[in-house]
Structure formats: structure tokens, C-alpha cells
């Protein structure tokens, strides 16, 4: 990659990192460990490539929400048909509820743990394909203030946590997200 002038590589996560307190999500799979990420990060750094963590934080959380521990955080507890389902005829929760403070608490704890393994001061929080936003628990708030405002309020809560962590790390964190 370095010979092709790449200077940044984003490591995309959904449920493919071995989060310490969340084994139920990755059990039976082959998630990356902290040690593996640190080795990859050092390898990239030595080649002037910035390795940036990318953890979806609203949509694409179905691999979490199918488990009882996380299901209460879902936008639609009874689920929906979505294109990323392993079984297309089965309804399952897809996204976190943007108006549930527990959703913010979960994703910021994931970000905090993940960031410990990266040199980069950047974090891509995904936020794409929020196909169920406003169709479940956040529906009334979306009607009241608008779906866009609900989305931005959730994004800002996550970003504010990153800024608090910036102070702890001694450098300004840059929050990135997709623009769809």
C-alpha cells in the first residue's frame, strides 16, 4: 500500500473486534484482538500509513442487537427485514435507538476500548444506512423535531465524548462519519 502512495487505511468493524465485555457478540467467530490491531497499527505506522478505526455506531449494529443484552437498545425490538440479514425471511433489529442514552453509552465504551489500540487521533463512527431511524422507538421524537435533528443530536453526544477523551489523550480527536 505504501508503494502505491496510500497514507490512510480504515479498519472497518461491526462485530469483528474482541471487545472485552462483549464476548457474546463475537463468540464463535474470529475477531481481531487488541494485540493483532496493535501489530497491524505498528506495521502501518512504520510505512507512513495511518490506520484509522471504523466502528459503526447507529446502523449496522444487528450483530449486536440480536442478543438479549443489547436488544433493548434497538430502534425496533421486533426487528425488520433488512438487506444484511443472514436469513432474509427473518426479522431482526438493525439499528440502535438514537434517543436511548444507553445506545450512546454502549458505542462510546466501544470507541474508548478500540481507540486504545491505535496511534491515530481519528475515529470513523460510521452512521450510514440508518434505515430504521424514526420507525420504532425514536418515531415520536423524529415527528417532534425531525429525523435529521434526532440523528445530529445522537452524533453530537458521541462527538462530545470523543472531545472529553481528547483531553485525556492530550490531542484533539477527529470524529469522522459517512455522508449518506
Whereabouts are the PLM-identified features?
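Substrate-binding cleft/loops of secretory-pathway carbohydrate-active enzymes
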Residues: 169-180
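Substrate-binding cleft of carbohydrate-active enzyme catalytic domains
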Residues: 1-168
Amino acid at each position: 500500500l505504501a508503494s502505491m502512495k496510500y497514507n490512510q487505511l480504515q479498519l472497518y468493524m461491526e462485530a469483528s473486534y474482541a471487545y472485552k465485555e462483549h464476548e457474546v457478540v463475537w463468540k464463535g467467530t474470529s475477531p481481531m484482538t487488541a494485540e493483532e490491531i496493535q501489530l497491524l497499527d505498528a506495521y502501518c505506522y512504520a510505512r507512513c500509513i495511518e490506520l484509522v478505526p471504523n466502528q459503526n455506531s447507529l446502523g449496522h449494529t444487528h450483530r449486536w442487537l440480536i442478543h438479549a443484552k443489547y436488544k433493548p437498545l434497538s430502534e425496533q425490538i421486533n426487528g425488520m427485514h433488512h438487506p444484511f440479514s443472514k436469513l432474509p425471511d427473518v426479522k431482526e433489529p438493525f439499528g440502535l435507538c438514537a434517543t436511548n442514552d444507553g445506545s450512546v453509552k454502549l458505542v462510546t465504551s466501544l470507541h474508548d476500548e478500540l481507540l486504545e489500540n491505535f496511534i491515530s487521533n481519528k475515529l470513523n463512527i460510521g452512521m450510514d444506512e440508518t434505515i430504521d431511524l424514526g420507525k420504532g422507538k425514536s418515531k415520536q421524537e423524529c415527528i417532534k423535531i425531525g429525523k435529521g435533528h434526532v440523528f445530529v443530536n445522537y452524533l453530537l453526544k458521541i462527538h462530545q465524548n470523543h472531545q472529553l477523551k481528547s483531553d485525556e489523550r492530550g490531542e484533539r480527536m477527529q470524529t469522522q462519519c459517512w455522508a449518506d
